[in-house]
Every structure is written in structure tokens, then in C-alpha cells.
Amino acid sequence: MKSDPTGPPDILIEPGAMYPPLSGVGYYARELLKAYSVLPGRFPMKILSYRFFLKSRTSAAEKYLETLAGEIGATVEIRRRTAPSGVHHRLRGSALRSPFPLDLAGPGGHRIYFFPNYVGAPLLRSTCVPVIYDLGFLRYPDALRARDHLYLRRYLPRTLRRASRIVVISETIKRELQEAFSIPDEKIAVIYPAVDHTAFRPDIPPEARAAVRAKYSLPGPYLFSLSTLEPRKNFPRLVEAYALLPADVRNRYPLAVAGGEGWKNEALFAAIRRLGLEDRVKFLGYIPGADRAPLMREADLFVLPSLYEGFGMPVLEAMACGTPVVTTERGAIPEVGGEAVVYADPLDPQSIAREMAAVLGDPALRRRLSAAGPLRAAAFRWEASARRLAGVFESAARDIP
């Protein structure tokens, strides 16, 4: 369906990152678009849905996109594919082939394509806006799966060259993008992630907190970490730091780790076995969105010893809940935490252990961090980020041929 060239342009959204289970990328895209959808004067939005041209029935994926469209105030635009979904997804997973159908090639009329997961359609000549979360594929290439590394190296430079505007999630990533690709300042917009302050807050109802304790078998005090289990999150050193805590501290505080299974995490499980911590480190698996806030709030300490972050969403969530945080100064984390968190050296398990013990053993420091966290987190709001996105789309609209 063609857009009216005399009216506002349509925003066409590539939804690949927003299928469940949501990662940080999918959560950012969904919440940002939800906030954008209620702004006055916003552009119409359409979610792209691909269907094999011989297929007529609605798939489960299409039904989910209809639900997502309702959440973000969009409609669904079905595009016909020339290959069944199984073949299409195998091509998407290959770093040697284009990840998008050929119907996203060529000019696209009075519309702006929004690609929330780094890469845009390589053959597209329409106005487009991608979102870049970090440059880990350049800074920590060994931490990625080989196919993901090759995919980004092949397609991201093309996307950046053809983009009308580029969204990044921190000033740190803006600087890195400019240094790596010589992109003009005016082409990049920093749009911070945020949290739902009605969910992530210190005064979460006691019944919600008790429910997650029962669900995840956490009856007493615990330390908490949440992220996909992958090398940049530095979980092996977190486990080594936990082992360095005094025995009475470990006996009082099990370490609960939540997050998707990830990749290249063999060193984490090897460290747990080597240190004999099988009964003290508890893996909770992927956590549904509704459980994140009460789990954060109930934790006595949140720890994220990342080697590199484009932002650090779990740090912000813990701060908003009033939970003390120990993290690192790597990547964009200081933009998030400021002086409301405690920083450790991610390469030194003794440093991580020392800061964890300092927070756990100092009630005055804990009270200060618990008070400072929500105040700092209050500056990150989806409404403000959505207004920034509106400005990006309005600027991109002026580039439509």
C-alpha cells in the first residue's frame, strides 16, 4: 500500500528484534515505540510482516505482530516473500546472504523505514533510520558468535552509509561510531533507554515481591545479576569474586543469576565447578518482564561486572528499584550510574569482591545508594526519549525524495 505523498510519511518498522522472548534490543524498541505512539502529531506506523506468497493462513507470528501493533498504535503491513519461512530464516542466519526479502530493495515512496536492530535492508534506497546499541563486534569480536560478527561486519557499514539518521543509545556509542565510521555529528541522535517507573520503583507491593521469591525459590537474602550469559557480561569473574567473599557472607547470600542462555558461556560453568559453588550460584533462566522489577527490588545487591555496555539497562532498573549496585566503568555505564552506584575493576575479581563486601557490610553506604538510585533513574523517561525519536523522524522526513 502506497503512502499519500501529500500527508505525513508512514514509519515502516522491521520487527525482527521484537519477537518474544525479548532481549534488551527488543525491549528498547517496543517501549520506545509505545511512548512514541501517544505523542500528538506522530507519524503513522506500520509493522512489516512477511508471508510466503503461496500461503494464505495467518501464522502465529502474524498473530503476535497484530498484538504488538495494538500495543504500539500501529497497523500490520503484509509483504509477500518468495521463499517459505524456514528457508527465509536460514538465509537470515547466514552472514553470507542478505537478511531481508528482496521487496525491501529499491525506492520505497513516502515512508521511512525504521530498523531497530542495527542493520537495514542492504538494497533499500528509501529513507531509513537504524538503531545502533554498541560496537562490540569491533571492540570485542571474540565475544560474539562468528556468524553475528560476520553479519555485522558485512551489513552494518552499508546501513550506516545509506541511513538518513542514526539512533544510538548513549553518548559513548555516538563517539565510538564517529571514530570508527567518520559519521557527521548531525546525522546521529542519542536516545537513551528508560524504565517504566510505575513498575520499577522502591515501593513494589509486598505480594508481588513474595510471589517472585516463591516462584524462583529465593526465601532469604540474595545477590542478583541479570543479563544474557555471554562473554562481555564477565560472569566468570563475578563467580570468582563471589568465591572470594568470606564464607559467612556466601552462606547468607546465594548468587542468583538471571538471563537467557546466550553463547560462549563454558568458562562460567567451568568456574562454578572449579570453585565448588554449585550449591551457591542459582540460575533462574530467562525472566519474564513482569518478574524483573520485584526480583530487582528484593535483592540485597545487584552486580553487573560487564566488560563493555552500550548503555546498561539492568543497572538502571536496579537503581530505579532502590537496590544498591556494584558495576564497572566500562562503556556507557557511567552515563547511567553516575555517582549513584559503586564501581569495580572488571578485570580484577578481588576488586569486584572488595566492592561487593563493602556495600554489604556498610549500612550507611547501602542507605545512600538506595536513596540515590531512584533519584538518578528518574532522569531516564520513555516520554523524553519518544520526543527525541519524533525529532529524528521529522528530520528524516525532510530527506524523502
Residue ranges of predicted features:
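Carbohydrate transferase catalytic cores enriched for Leloir-type hexosyltransferases
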Residues: 1-401
